[in-house]
């Protein structure tokens, strides 16, 4: 029979109606001769009642054979429950079953199909099709669908054109490692799966499309963590003839619409703007979480003349104050923080406690001469804990930034109901790579340098600033964008600054440089990580929770066993040999 409606949508207005439902058996309970079944589908749970006095013997026998996750079809009449269940949207009604049939049986599942299970991640991914049956997972993907629907509506209304760009592209340097795809037709040659549609979307601007967008899969062969996957989805957009401010306005409007459509929240516009240097110096991060205080404070000038070489000879001395929580941190707890500090390159972690109008701790004896100035500068109050890092500016900022976030989580200082958006602007164009021993693009090599600093492309690269902007939400980089280079000579200068020879630049990016000979318009854009955005909206801490079939931390799929070995014949067709491998 045809299904009448979703089980989770039956309400009191349907009382007296004969309906047919289809779904999975959640729980089965036998009480006083009656059998109660929780029927589950994607919209929720509906209670079924099978009364032996009202159904045939065959229906009763079928009901008695039901087990969890059997797929069934039932028909009956909607009636009012004697005692409502306020925990269910369907809690005022139940279905008095008249007909029942089994559409499929099920083995015992490796974990219960319910929220809050304790199965490990690999088990959940091994049986992902079962994991996705759980209500909280279904809700995550309904939310994701609402987000993409809202984004498409917004951008369509602004006359953006949805264009699909190639999945098989050219491998180019800079950025993460590419996933390579060997070509059978062009032996010895490889495609790359795109890390982003960066160059192709810029070429669409040269084609006169003016406003482009795409919700697109991207691929990066990089080390994984909670907010990264080897394949991920981004909301990609590009525009012509707009300023960076105008692009940011468009993105803010899009996010405001998503927040209204999915969470019912009105966000305040425009978003705050914070210079990159301020973010690093005050928060120790280029993606600052502004839901709590505990800002980094520079004490270099105050401590430079103390008789403590760790402080007096350091490039900088910075500190954070953990307000009114000194009693929460024993020596053992502080030692744990010290180990974290060392992971970020710090040589150690100095600390003080402030109580009864005086400082105490291992370094207190060195600071008595400046205790008053220190107390005033840090606005110390009873039971404050002060943590110091004396090192280079970069190490001090990064270390204290990491400790700031760690401590805020430990002490539950974060208001998780807040959605704090902000722009980080005024970025450096380059960042120094110790591993590479050279400057690399902070974003990518197509970012436009500011007019005031472009001359430093042939000088001090540390002084070059970019017309770039990142959008940050609650301590996560939600997306990044910039105005792009559209002048050939500037692009060639950029490649040279990054260490490309003229021949190498031509080999890697000749098609882009050639396009710049044909009236390339001023343009810019942005990409937002869709998975990360949905993760934050759903209140999760891992993007696997909002990706239907994710990979684990080894970039593997426990369900399909991808990646896998391939046959010798397949390798021969590609003229490839595998020298060695480990199972």
Swiss-Prot record:
Q: Where is this region: Aspartate?
A: 198-201
Top class in the EC scheme: ligase
A GO biological-process term: aspartyl-tRNA aminoacylation
- May I have one GO cellular component term? cytoplasm
UniProt cross-references to InterPro entries, sorted A to Z: Aa-tRNA-synt_II, aa-tRNA-synth_II, aa-tRNA-synth_II/BPL/LPL, Asp-tRNA-ligase_1, Asp-tRNA-ligase_1_N, Asp/Asn-tRNA-synth_IIb, AspRS_core, GAD-like_sf
Task: State which gene encodes it.
Answer: aspS
Q: What is the name of this protein?
A: Aspartate--tRNA ligase
Identify its protein family.
Belongs to the class-II aminoacyl-tRNA synthetase family. Type 1 subfamily.
């Amino acid at each position: 029979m045809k299904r009448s409606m979703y089980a989770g949508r039956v309400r009191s207005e349907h009382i007296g109606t004969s309906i047919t439902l289809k779904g999975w058996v959640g729980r089965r309970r036998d009480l006083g001769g009656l059998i109660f079944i929780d029927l589950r589908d994607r919209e929720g749970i509906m209670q079924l009642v099978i009364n032996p006095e009202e159904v045939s013997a065959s229906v009763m026998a079928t009901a008695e054979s039901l087990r969890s996750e059997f797929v069934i079809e039932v028909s009956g009449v909607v009636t009012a429950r004697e005692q409502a269940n306020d925990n269910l949207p369907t809690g005022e009604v139940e279905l008095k079953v008249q007909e029942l049939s089994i559409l499929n049986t099920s083995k015992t599942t490796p974990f219960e199909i319910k929220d809050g299970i304790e199965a490990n991640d690999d088990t959940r991914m091994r049986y992902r099709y079962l994991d996705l049956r759980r209500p909280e997972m279904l809700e995550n993907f309904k939310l994701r669908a609402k987000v993409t629907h809202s984004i498409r509506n917004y951008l369509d209304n602004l006359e953006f054109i949805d264009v699909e760009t190639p999945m098989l592209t050219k491998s180019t340097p800079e950025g993460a490692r590419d996933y390579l795809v060997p070509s059978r037709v062009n032996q010895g040659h490889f495609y790359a799966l795109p890390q982003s549609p960066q160059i192709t979307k810029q070429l669409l601007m040269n084609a006169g499309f003016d406003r482009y967008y795409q919700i697109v899969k991207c691929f990066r062969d990089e080390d994984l963590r909670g907010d990264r996957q080897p394949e991920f989805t981004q909301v990609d957009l590009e525009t012509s003839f707009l300023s960076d401010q105008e692009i940011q306005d468009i993105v803010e409007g899009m996010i405001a619409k998503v927040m209204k459509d999915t969470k019912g929240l009105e966000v305040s516009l425009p978003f705050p703007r914070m210079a990159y240097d301020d973010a690093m110096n005050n928060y120790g991060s280029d993606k600052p979480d502004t839901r709590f205080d505990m800002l980094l404070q520079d004490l270099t000038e105050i401590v430079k003349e103390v008789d403590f070489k760790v402080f007096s000879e350091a490039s900088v001395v910075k500190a954070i104050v953990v307000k009114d929580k000194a009693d929460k941190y024993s020596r053992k707890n502080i030692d744990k923080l010290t180990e974290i500090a060392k992971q970020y390159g710090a040589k150690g972690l100095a600390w003080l406690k402030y109580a009864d109008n005086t400082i105490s701790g291992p370094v207190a004896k060195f600071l008595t001469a400046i205790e008053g100035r220190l107390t005033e500068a840090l606005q110390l109050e009873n039971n404050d804990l002060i943590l110091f890092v004396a090192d280079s500016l970069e190490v001090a900022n990064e270390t204290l930034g990491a400790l700031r976030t760690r401590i805020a989580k430990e002490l539950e200082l974060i208001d998780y109901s807040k959605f704090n958006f902000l722009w980080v602007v005024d970025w450096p164009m380059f960042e120094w790579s110790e591993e590479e021993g050279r400057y690399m693009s902070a974003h990518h090599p197509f970012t436009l340098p500011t007019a005031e600093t472009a001359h430093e492309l042939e000088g001090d690269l540390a002084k070059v600033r970019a017309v770039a902007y990142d959008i940050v939400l609650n301590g996560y980089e939600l997306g990044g964008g910039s105005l792009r280079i559209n002048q050939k000579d500037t692009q060639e200068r950029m490649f040279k600054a990054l260490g490309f020879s003229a021949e190498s630049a031509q080999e890697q990016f000749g098609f882009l440089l050639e396009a710049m000979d044909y009236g390339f318009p001023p343009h810019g854009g942005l990409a937002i990580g869709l998975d990360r955005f949905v993760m934050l909206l759903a209140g999760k801490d891992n993007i696997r929770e909002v990706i239907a079939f994710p990979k684990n931390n080894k970039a593997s799929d426990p369900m399909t066993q991808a990646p896998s070995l391939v046959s010798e014949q397949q390798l021969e067709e590609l003229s490839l040999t595998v020298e060695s491998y480990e199972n």
